[in-house]
Amino acid sequence: MTSQAVRDPLKDELLTPQNAALIIIDFQPVQVNSIASMDRQMLVNNIVGVAKLGVAFGLPIVFSSVNVKTGLNKPPIAQLRKVLGNITTYDRTTINAWEDTEFNEAVKATKRKKLIIAALWTEACLTYPALDALREGYEVYPVVDAVGGTSVEAHQAALRRIEQAGAKPIGWVQLACELQRDWIRKETVPAFMDIFIETGGTMGLQLSYDKDSHA
């Protein structure tokens, strides 16, 4: 039961807190309420879990909204703003966030080549920046159970399109486990456990029972 030495986190092929950045785009009331590809409450639950992972593991986070300053849209949902606190929000008029100068510069300023992306809708605000990032040599990891589209068909077609272009789909639980990787890395275990307890569904319930039994 001996763990191997930690691989170079900057060169690791898997996602690490040191080689990845998290991008969250357009989780606003209109977009959330128009999702028809999955249960909306579960969508919110999952993106909150993703955001908590980003904070807990110290990932650079680029957070963006669309059309708030123009008055055409509302700010991001309160559940996300509570987790992310006073993080800068890059508001845009572009549907493709990659074509917004400030957003684009913020992503490149992270100096991370692995981009974990969650955006609404899958068929627009996820697809377009994902394709552009891939074209520029980034690795793109769409969090498939924390994004949604205006229909199941639109969501699935969009994911196929970006996967065919080279994107690497990932689920939020897979993301959590990939960032943690080893229980011996004790500094992040408490947050890892708490995120599952708060947002991990039936698995979270089991962990909460186990945690209580050892309290």
Model feature map: region roles:
Residues K82, E105, L131, R135:
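Short, well-ordered alpha-helices that flank and scaffold nucleotide-derived cofactor binding pockets
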Residues R92-E105:
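Short phosphate-binding loop-to-helix
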Residues I95-A97, A109, A133:
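Long, charged low-complexity segments
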